[in-house]
């Protein structure tokens, strides 16, 4: 007979650090995005540089919810073609998987996407002029902290997150 381990997975969520507890790094550049206040704040050597308004984010609780957590800038592209919507995303800054910070997107024929609900396919959208300024300022490897209490809400508790095995917790029975 093969015995199955008697450990129960314990749920944890993506790491979101609230503004109350966030401290920017004292050296180098950092980006802090608060998806509740819809603000993106930049820091350099621990000091505030500028604040931008976030125009759209992934809808909380949906498949496209923008994930909270601690990341780094992985890639910068002046113009990136989205694999989700086949639209151009100007001044794209990739921070995790298929998630980017970028300017207002436009179709391949050059027409901008209409302003709508304030939700995106998961990316963090800025005004294109703001995205350009951020793109020119940020470096590959810059810390990116994304905060959202939505990913921690009770409505969402069973749809997002990861499991961590806790060997001290036994399955009864």
Where do the PLM segments sit?
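Gly/Pro-biased beta-strand-loop elements
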Residues: 7-111
């Amino acid at each position: 007979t093969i015995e199955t381990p008697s450990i129960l997975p314990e749920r944890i969520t993506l790491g979101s650090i609230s503004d109350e507890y966030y401290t920017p790094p004292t050296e180098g550049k950092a980006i802090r995005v608060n998806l509740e206040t819809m603000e993106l704040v930049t820091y350099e050597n621990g000091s505030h540089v500028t604040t931008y308004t976030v125009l759209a984010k992934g809808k909380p609780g949906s498949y496209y919810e923008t994930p909270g957590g601690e990341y780094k800038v992985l890639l910068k592209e002046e113009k990136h073609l989205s694999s989700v919507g086949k639209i151009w995303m100007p001044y794209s800054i990739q921070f995790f998987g298929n998630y980017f910070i970028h300017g207002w997107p436009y179709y391949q024929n050059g027409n901008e996407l209409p302003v709508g609900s304030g939700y995106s396919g998961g990316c963090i959208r800025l005004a294109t002029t703001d995205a350009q300024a951020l793109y020119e300022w940020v470096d590959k490897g810059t810390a990116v902290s994304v905060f959202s209490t939505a990913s921690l809400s009770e409505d969402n508790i069973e749809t997002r997150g990861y499991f961590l095995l806790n060997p001290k917790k036994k399955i009864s029975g």
